[in-house]
Regions:
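N-terminal cap/lid segment of alpha/beta-hydrolase-fold proteins
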Residues: 21-69
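Alpha/beta-hydrolase active-site loop
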Residues: 130-155
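The feature captures the conserved acid-bearing segment of alpha/beta-hydrolase catalytic domains
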Residues: 187, 193-258
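C-terminal catalytic histidine-bearing segment of alpha/beta-hydrolase fold enzymes
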Residues: 251-307
């Protein structure tokens, strides 16, 4: 599903602004204030496939609910760009997924593993993972466990109830961690997990899929908690069939996992986590409800209220300087949504999960927001 996102970075805050997904944390970056987003650091010791061992700082992005908690935890893990692009792979910010999880009642910790972003350099413990899947998996999983230990120092986190999740190599990391059965772990969510793919050089043909099946089948015997595996048909890293074989190896090895397969998403289904929330959110929500986390968290548009006509720009409760943004919203394709804040700010989105993205884009500046319009209807009720 094609996604178009638009949000204005200066609608609710004065002073320097400018946030970009994956960019290094800079003085001008606008953090998600409503999620209490911040970057903390811990240390981790890891080995590469050659036996070289290093101890380095691991930056951890934090998203959390209001209040003191303690809240259950999700450790969310990033993927790995191809070698040509890894140097520019910045801080991982799965903000929209984190918004859902925080609304569900979780603290979300996102470690930027060693060899990425601020620790990119000569030491890469995930190098040649295609040849040594176990070495790279353990290096990555060790940093999940280091993040868990760090979380025990945070008073708002309950580490006796936690989940692990991730996308691509972060999904591989998730499976490896579940296979270690750490204390307090309740489940794992694997978005498009794997390693050894190259969508440009060999689309749909990872370099060592048999080794992946063997490795996951072997570590499955130690797994104790259920998993949810989510893959998209047009994944250009793994193709449509390899993930099913990997899942079968995991289950036949003695582990529990539900496989959720989705149709094509965008030009490369490998990125369905970001581009196909409309489809995966209900599936993940059902999984979390089964684990006991039943708080509603998926943003849905209310019924039309008749407050104003959809094209009545002057009726929109935003500052006068923001009226033009609503006019732009009216030119967007459906599905689309427009949210307003209590301070006259706004956020809008068109495409996948438009309602949730619009509200998130609006309230990331720290002010409460509500949907004003969805598709061709005004859904806002004056407060």
């Amino acid at each position: 599903m094609r996604v178009f996102l638009a949000f204005f970075l200066a609608v609710q805050l004065c002073g320097p602004v400018g946030a970009q997904e994956g960019s290094p944390l800079a003085a001008t970056e606008v953090l998600a204030l409503d999620l209490h987003e911040e970057v903390l650091r811990t240390q981790a010791t890891v080995k590469d496939m050659f036996g070289r061992q290093e101890t380095m700082h691991v930056p951890i992005t934090v998203y959390r609910p209001e209040g003191d908690g303690p809240y259950p935890l999700v450790v969310f893990n990033h993927g790995r760009a191809t070698d040509a692009k890894r140097a520019s792979q910045g801080r991982y910010r799965p903000e929209m997924a984190a918004r859902y999880l925080v609304a569900k009642g979780f603290v979300v910790l996102v470690p930027n593993r060693i060899g990425y972003w601020q620790t990119f350099g000569s030491f890469d413990p995930e190098y040649s993972g295609c040849k040594s899947i176990d070495a790279m998996s353990m290096a990555a999983s060790n940093q999940v466990l280091a993040t868990l230990e760090f979380a025990k120092t945070l008073p708002y986190v309950d580490t006796s109830r936690w989940l692990v999740a991730g996308q691509s190599v972060g999904g591989l990391t998730t499976v490896a961690t579940v296979g270690r059965a750490p204390a307090g772990l309740l489940g794992g969510i694997n978005f498009s997990g794997g390693t050894g793919g190259d969508p440009d050089a060999r689309p749909g043909r990872p370099c060592n899929p048999v080794a992946m099946s063997q490795y996951w089948g072997e570590i499955a015997k130690n797994a104790k908690v259920p998993m949810l595996w989510l893959y998209w048909e047009n994944d250009k890293y793994w193709g449509p069939d390899h993930p099913k074989v990997w899942h079968r190896a995991w289950v036949e090895g003695g582990a529990q996992a539900t496989f959720a397969g989705f149709g094509p998403s965008g030009s490369n289904g490998h990125f369905g986590l970001n581009e196909d929330m409309d489809h995966w959110l209900p599936v993940v929500d059902e999984f979390l409800v089964r684990l006991g986390f039943d708080k509603p968290a998926i943003v849905k548009a209310p019924q039309p209220t008749g407050f104003a006509a959809i094209d009545a720009v002057d009726a929109v409760p935003v500052r006068p300087s923001n009226k033009a943004a609503y006019a732009k919203f009216l030119d967007m394709a459906k599905p689309r949504a427009f949210a307003v804040s209590t301070k006259g700010g706004f956020g809008y989105a068109s495409g996948d999960y438009a309602a949730g993205r619009a509200v998130g884009n609006c309230q990331r500046y720290g002010n409460p927001c509500a949907l004003y319009a969805a598709d061709a209807d005004v859904v806002w009720t004056p407060q």
